[in-house]
Amino acid sequence: MAFLWLLSCWALLGTTFGCGVPAIHPVLSGLSRIVNGEDAVPGSWPWQVSLQDKTGFHFCGGSLISEDWVVTAAHCGVRTSDVVVAGEFDQGSDEENIQVLKIAKVFKNPKFSILTVNNDITLLKLATPARFSQTVSAVCLPSADDDFPAGTLCATTGWGKTKYNANKTPDKLQQAALPLLSNAECKKSWGRRITDVMICAGASGVSSCMGDSGGPLVCQKDGAWTLVGIVSWGSRTCSTTTPAVYARVAKLIPWVQKILAAN
């Protein structure tokens, strides 16, 4: 059964820091919850943010694409009363140099449909810019014609559940390496629900899960990590043999560019 991977309470870039090149290098196992993932190296995914409500509850992930903008999933339902937390690794620690950033404006893709989960992207304009540092910087955006072929090994990160029936999410940021799938291959699991604005990955022993929604699926291009997908939906039990489905960022770039240019 298809399932959106947000957590509900009830269950253009910096000159000093180029995009997609972390100051602290990530270390990924070839097969690294996320289901069957592993703790990330602290600070090694500097664009990863946590979206939290006013009680401090983490409900979705997101990615910094500049000092002023975060990209996440439309189905996360972010509001301006929520906050973006940047520079975080361990959500159980009070020792980290985090940035808690207010949201000025929420731009949900007007073509988003909760029924089909097509166009699952929202842009967040920050009220005050993030301060880029060793542990806070932007991911690169793909161009509209970028092609990331099936079989490409990519990475996804998040504080989502490490088992679908876990009572709580992990404190430490999780990561997993996983291959991209062709949409034809993905349709073997999900049928006509898979559209050209989606990209699939996984079915390789790892999976995104509840609480990872909105976070990044990144692949390396010319030595820089590029945002290929946004965690969107998948198996209700976060099955590691079923592909996870992500919003296909390259297809959504024209809309992103339009919003950034107008704001």
From Swiss-Prot:
Record-linked Gene3D superfamilies: Trypsin-like serine proteases
Entry's Gene Ontology molecular function annotations: serine-type endopeptidase activity
Catalytic activity: Preferential cleavage: Tyr-|-Xaa, Trp-|-Xaa, Phe-|-Xaa, Leu-|-Xaa
Database matches in SMART domains: Tryp_SPc
One GO CC annotation: extracellular region
Annotated catalytic residues: 75, 120, 213
Chief localisation class: secreted
Subcellular location: Secreted, Extracellular space
Coiled coil: none
Keywords per UniProt: Digestion, Disulfide bond, Hydrolase, Protease, Secreted, Serine protease, Signal, Zymogen
Domain of life, per lineage: Eukaryota
GO biological process: digestion; proteolysis
Extent of the signal sequence: 1-18
Family: Belongs to the peptidase S1 family.
EC number(s) from the headed UniProt entry: 3.4.21.1
Protein's recorded name: Chymotrypsinogen B2
S-S bonds: 19-140, 60-76, 154-219, 186-200, 209-238
Top-level EC class as recorded in UniProt: hydrolase
Every Peptidase S1 domain range: 34-261
Species per Swiss-Prot/TrEMBL record: Homo sapiens (Human)
